[in-house]
């Protein structure tokens, strides 16, 4: 079998930067799926992407499909020949359809009889005749929400396409992609590079870089930008703030990255750095620079898409562009400082949170009361919690947050400090929204936790209370994120809070707003479902989660302790046998009619094995009681694992359902007592 390397490139107008990686990865995944379906062997495959191109490279691709032997089964021998042994019309028709005579057919014997069969050799199709159609199907399946047309063509794609190149080794593959005929011409950088004729698939990256002035390898371009930005920051005694999301976007915006350093007036540093960083990152795609102490420097790093003879001119241009945005931030900050956050409370009455749940003023009133309630249970300062809850949304009415929306909470913190609020109140203003995304940190300050929980629970109970629970993928109020936030805050801070109590208080504060009588139960179920999903994402086995869920613990911190304990129990040698024994006990007890016996009469313990089990339980119970009381479930299950030998011997020697009613009930009481000890933690009978 011979092999060649394949190169496919699509030359386009500027592709959406935030979609570039996904488009390229999907193109590659779709195409390699096509190769697999076509039984075309290859060694490896890679994708390339730049603002004006998508490309894939397949190494050591078979130049043709392998020949195949295809078994074509005909009629059964019993119906293929008549009484005189002559072929029937059915046999002749089948043979004729396969281009053979009946005499040329072979016979296949199976357990269901004997059949005529023809093993036809099917020659593999040349790869070059398949590539264009496969590439087109791969493009057709790309995740493009809003495709567009261009010119007079009816072809649709995410952006207009100008060139298509398909090379198998040095051979140009004929065909079209998105209405563009395959050709060797590859476009270079819009200003710096030249177009060229690609002679061989292997030369794509090299020629594109040397002649086209385009670094098509996305990961190489990204690494180059990061390294150069870090060097540039170090030269001015700082560290560049290079978040991966912004780095990805910048990488998707440039074909030939040139990293430059610029500056802005130091007077702007009087504005909270978060606002300056927001506009530098969000609006301008710049990398801010911080000193060793984490203080923002009056510099920024940006990436040009051209190697200029006069870089100072490009630097000056970017400084000129960013200055008005920084001046806006300065103006908003100075204007906002003239009014306290408390003075903005009346304006919250003009903003609707939700038609049935009232205004933002109504919401902060509820948050304030609920935050104080939570603070009392966690030992936090309830006065600060109530104050922070009341002010929690006031910064939404400031000029700064209206213009730079992502600074909500953060600017509230700065304004609260300027107003003379306590540090706990100020910090809660910022941390109320945490965690904002998967992997984000949770608030740790006690008042911040109370306010963050109150905000999320108020939304959850309110939206469920008006019958607008999330359905399918739709979640307009981000309730799934709120639910995970509630659970993470409680678990990671080990807060002694009960979900039932919190939900009931939130429901009480909503008063007559809620129309759904089942809201509290639905919110609890929703939180439990999020709990399960969260633990599954962390790699916890489903049966461990179900074993704990069976006990319906409604204190998240306690729930987490049980999960950890059962996970540890699974690692013990005795766990499988005890889980099986618990399942057996559960099945026996489930068949008992009426109330289960609980009192164990030692005088009725007739067999040595039941005496030993009862004695072992009696020995363990004084040790277990304080462990259960202190939620030391891991140690409790470790102690219970010592029951394995006694339990195994019991089931080997003792007939539980004895004819003697007193003996039977006493043994049932013993098993019930055994099971109850495990149920203090989880239903381990559900462990697989």
Swiss-Prot record:
Keywords tagged on the record: Aminoacyl-tRNA synthetase, ATP-binding, Cytoplasm, Ligase, Nucleotide-binding, Protein biosynthesis
Subcellular location: Cytoplasm
GO molecular function: arginine-tRNA ligase activity; ATP binding; glycine-tRNA ligase activity
Family annotation (InterPro entries): DALR_anticod-bd, Gly-tRNA-synth_bsu, Gly-tRNA-synth_heterodimer
Gene Ontology biological-process annotations: arginyl-tRNA aminoacylation; glycyl-tRNA aminoacylation
EC number(s) reported in the record: 6.1.1.14
A Pfam cross-reference name: tRNA_synt_2f
SUPFAM superfamilies: HD-domain/PDEase-like (SSF109604)
Enzyme class: ligase
Gene Ontology CC: cytosol
Gene3D superfamilies: Isoleucyl-tRNA Synthetase, Domain 1
Catalysed reaction equations from the record: tRNA(Gly) + glycine + ATP = glycyl-tRNA(Gly) + AMP + diphosphate
Assigned protein family: Belongs to the class-II aminoacyl-tRNA synthetase family.
UniProt cross-references to NCBIfam families, sorted A to Z: glyS
HAMAP family: Gly_tRNA_synth_beta
Assembly mode: Tetramer of two alpha and two beta subunits.
Protein name, per record: Glycine--tRNA ligase beta subunit
Organism encoding this protein: Shewanella sp. (strain MR-7)
Lineage, broadest ranks: Bacteria, Pseudomonadati, Pseudomonadota, Gammaproteobacteria, Alteromonadales
């Amino acid at each position: 079998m011979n092999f060649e390397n394949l190169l496919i490139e699509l030359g386009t107008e500027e592709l959406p930067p935030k979609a570039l990686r996904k488009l390229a990865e999907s193109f590659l995944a779709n195409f390699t799926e096509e190769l697999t379906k076509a039984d075309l062997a290859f060694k490896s495959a890679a994708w390339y992407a730049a603002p004006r191109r998508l490309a894939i490279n397949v190494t050591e691709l078979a130049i043709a499909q392998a020949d195949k032997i295809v078994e074509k089964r005909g009629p059964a021998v019993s119906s293929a020949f008549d009484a005189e042994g002559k072929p029937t019309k059915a046999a002749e028709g089948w043979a004729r359809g396969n281009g053979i005579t009946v005499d040329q057919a072979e016979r296949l014997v199976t357990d269901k009889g004997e059949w005529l069969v023809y093993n036809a050799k099917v020659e593999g199709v040349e790869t070059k005749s398949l590539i264009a159609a496969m590439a087109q199907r791969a493009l057709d399946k790309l995740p493009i929400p809003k495709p567009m047309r261009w010119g007079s063509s009816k072809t649709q794609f995410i952006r207009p396409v100008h060139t298509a190149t398909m090379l198998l080794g040095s051979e140009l593959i004929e065909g079209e992609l998105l209405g563009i005929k395959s050709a060797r011409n590859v476009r270079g950088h819009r200003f710096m590079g030249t177009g060229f004729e690609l002679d061989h698939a292997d030369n794509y990256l090299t020629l594109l870089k040397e002649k086209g002035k385009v670094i098509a390898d996305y990961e190489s371009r990204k690494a180059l930008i990061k390294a150069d930005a870090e060097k540039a920051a170090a030269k001015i005694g700082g560290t560049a703030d290079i978040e991966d999301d912004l780095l990805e976007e910048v990488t998707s915006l440039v074909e030939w990255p040139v990293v430059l350093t610029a500056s802005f007036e130091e007077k702007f540093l009087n504005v909270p750095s978060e606002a300056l960083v927001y506009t530098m990152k969000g609006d301008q795609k710049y990398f801010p620079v911080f000193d060793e102490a984490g203080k923002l420097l009056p510099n920024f790093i940006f990436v040009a898409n051209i190697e200029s003879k006069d870089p100072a001119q490009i630097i000056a241009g970017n400084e000129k562009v960013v200055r008005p945005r920084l001046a806006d931030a300065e103006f908003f900050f100075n204007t906002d400082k003239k009014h306290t956050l408390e003075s903005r409370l009346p304006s919250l009455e003009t903003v609707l949170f939700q038609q049935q749940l009232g205004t933002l003023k109504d919401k902060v009133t509820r948050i304030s009361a609920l935050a104080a309630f939570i603070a009392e249970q966690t030992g936090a300062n309830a006065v600060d919690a109530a104050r922070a809850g009341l002010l929690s949304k006031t910064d939404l009415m400031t000029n700064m947050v209206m213009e730079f929306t992502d600074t909500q909470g953060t600017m509230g913190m700065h304004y609260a400090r300027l107003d003379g609020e306590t540090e706990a109140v100020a910090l809660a203003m910022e941390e109320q929204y945490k965690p904002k995304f998967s992997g984000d940190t949770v608030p740790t300050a006690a008042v911040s936790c109370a306010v963050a929980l109150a905000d999320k629970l108020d939304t959850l109970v309110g939206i469920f209370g008006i019958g607008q629970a999330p359905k399918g993928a739709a979640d307009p109020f981000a309730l799934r994120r709120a639910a995970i936030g509630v659970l993470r805050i409680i678990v990671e801070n080990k807060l002694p809070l009960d979900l039932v109590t919190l939900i009931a208080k939130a429901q009480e504060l909503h008063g007559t707003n809620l129309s759904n009588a089942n809201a509290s139960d639905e919110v609890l179920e929703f939180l439990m479902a999020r709990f399960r999903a969260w633990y599954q994402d962390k790699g916890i086995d489903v049966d461990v989660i179900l074993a704990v869920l069976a006990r319906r613990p409604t204190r998240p911190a306690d729930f987490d302790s049980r999960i950890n304990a059962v996970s540890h129990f699974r690692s013990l040698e005795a766990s499988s046998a005890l889980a099986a024994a618990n399942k057996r006990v559960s099945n026996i007890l489930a068949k008992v009619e009426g109330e289960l016996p609980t009192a164990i009469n030692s005088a009725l313990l007739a067999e040595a094995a039941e005496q030993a089990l009862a004695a072992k339980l009696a020995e363990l119970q004084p040790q277990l009681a304080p462990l259960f009381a202190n939620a030391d479930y891991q140690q409790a299950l470790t102690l219970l694992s010592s029951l394995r030998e006694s339990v195994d011997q019991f089931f080997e020697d003792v007939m539980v359902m004895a004819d003697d009613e007193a003996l039977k009930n006493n043994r049932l009481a013993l098993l019930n007592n055994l099971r109850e000890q495990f149920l203090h933690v989880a239903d381990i009978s559900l462990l697989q």
